[in-house]
Regions:
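Core dinuclear metal-dependent hydrolase active-site scaffold
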Residues: 14-69
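Long hydrophobic alpha-helices with heptad-repeat/coiled-coil character
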Residues: 1, 51-53, 146-148
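Cap/insert and terminal regions of metallo-dependent hydrolase folds
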Residues: 65-152
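Short, well-ordered coil/turn elements that cap or connect secondary structure elements
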Residues: 6-8, 22-24, 48, 117-118, ...
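Sparse, context-dependent recognition of short Cys/His-centered cofactor- or disulfide-binding micro-motifs
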Residues: 5, 27-29, 54-55, 93, ...
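Generic structural signal for short, flexible, solvent-exposed coil/loop and linker residues
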Residues: 9-11, 21, 31-33, 92, ...
Length: 152
């Protein structure tokens, strides 16, 4: 029994590149880049639909195809972050941590360009910074780039 009173039989340990069947779902964890221990993203599949989930990462080395739904962190934009450092809204040390732990708008665009989006139906932008992000701008730019609905 876990601290949340979940029986052991209902708990699953997810490990990088080790797909798990959970009911009708197939969960494939993959390594992401972050300053935390063992950061993971997830390809989640049920029947013929795939959801890709990536948050708390600044880079993903893998390429994906046949993605139907994408939930991805889009934490900040480089220009907003730099402006906040210049205006002393955030400290240079905090900027360094943001750069080493979070997906920027620019990196999200690079990630999208590197992957097959032909089956993509919608994108959900996650974990947008209150100070270093602009949800409406991010939504507009990603939607214009991909041609699919984007939600924040």
């Amino acid at each position: 029994m876990s601290a949340l009173n979940v029986p052991d039989s209902r708990q699953f340990i997810l490990k990088e590149k080790d797909a798990q069947n959970i009911g009708e779902w197939i969960i494939l964890p993959f390594q992401t880049e972050h300053d935390a221990k063992e950061p993971l993203g997830f390809m989640i599949q049920r029947h013929n639909e795939r959801l890709l989930f990536i948050t708390d990462s600044y880079f993903v080395r893998y390429k994906f195809k046949n993605i139907n739904y994408l939930m991805i962190e889009c934490n900040y934009s480089a220009d907003i972050l730099e402006e906040n450092v210049i205006n002393k809204v955030i400290h240079q040390v905090q900027k360094k941590r943001v750069l080493q732990s979070h997906f920027s708008l620019e990196n999200v665009k690079e990630f999208l360009n590197a992957n097959d989006l032909s089956q993509l139906r919608e994108i959900h932008l996650l974990h947008i910074s209150e100070r270093n992000g602009d949800p409406e701008r991010f939504k507009k730019e990603i939607q214009a780039m991909t041609g699919v609905p984007v939600y924040v």
